């Protein structure tokens, strides 16, 4: 079989409400996932064993890497003896709240499912995805906007995309998920907006009036600890964003812009200092 190259796209979170802590140590949450065009590229080639190379020397390529773990979990699930050589061109920043590692893992599951002629259904692969990470099912199963509950693995496809230009900025701070969950300002039990319904409405009409309802429970703690992240958030609003927010647990921040001109101007203000991405309205991961 010839080599295959595939993009693995990142995501942002439109709102993120942490609703409680579970007995297993995980937290329940509600969020809206939205894809962005920032992506890694994975190349898969036939091989006798599972191996990996990466353009970013800071990322391990041993058994701790999510790509290797995904390949091995699928190999064990299907009982196949085939190997694969994976080359990862890493462009999505890690420790950014953009789900880059989760997207890579989901791409490995999806591609190797066909590469190894396993042909399992998405429902079959879902348990493997959950074990790899709470965000992995989104990248495996969805294309555009999706509501997520549970630990992020209970998904509802909203069959839509964001109607705005999305500027995403990585302020060069790597924030661990463990730190974020240990420091966010808890407000369990408080009333929350129905973000599933609101997001479905917003995607169709581009109404900016209710965007402020999409709060991120990590944001205030991250802004207190990492002033550079707060500064980028302020800069995006000053550049004309109708809404700006932390993505996930950070440190990436995004702004939603109504015009391409405003979005490009915002990008120009940031790209001299930080990695940036511009995603067009209605973007889908399966384009």
Curated annotation (Swiss-Prot):
It is an enzyme of class 2 (transferase). GO terms for molecular function: 4-(cytidine 5'-diphospho)-2-C-methyl-D-erythritol kinase activity; ATP binding. It catalyses: 4-CDP-2-C-methyl-D-erythritol + ATP = 4-CDP-2-C-methyl-D-erythritol 2-phosphate + ADP + H(+). Pfam families: GHMP_kinases_C, GHMP_kinases_N. Pathway: Isoprenoid biosynthesis; isopentenyl diphosphate biosynthesis via DXP pathway; isopentenyl diphosphate from 1-deoxy-D-xylulose 5-phosphate: step 3/6. Coiled coil: none annotated. Its EC number is 2.7.1.148. The keyword Transport does not apply. InterPro entries: GHMP_kinase_C_dom, GHMP_kinase_C_sf, GHMP_kinase_N_dom, IspE, Ribosomal_Su5_D2-typ_SF, Ribsml_uS5_D2-typ_fold_subgr. The active site is at 11, 135. ATP binds at residues 93-103. Catalyzes the phosphorylation of the position 2 hydroxy group of 4-diphosphocytidyl-2C-methyl-D-erythritol. Belongs to the GHMP kinase family. IspE subfamily. NCBIfam families: ispE. This is 4-diphosphocytidyl-2-C-methyl-D-erythritol kinase.
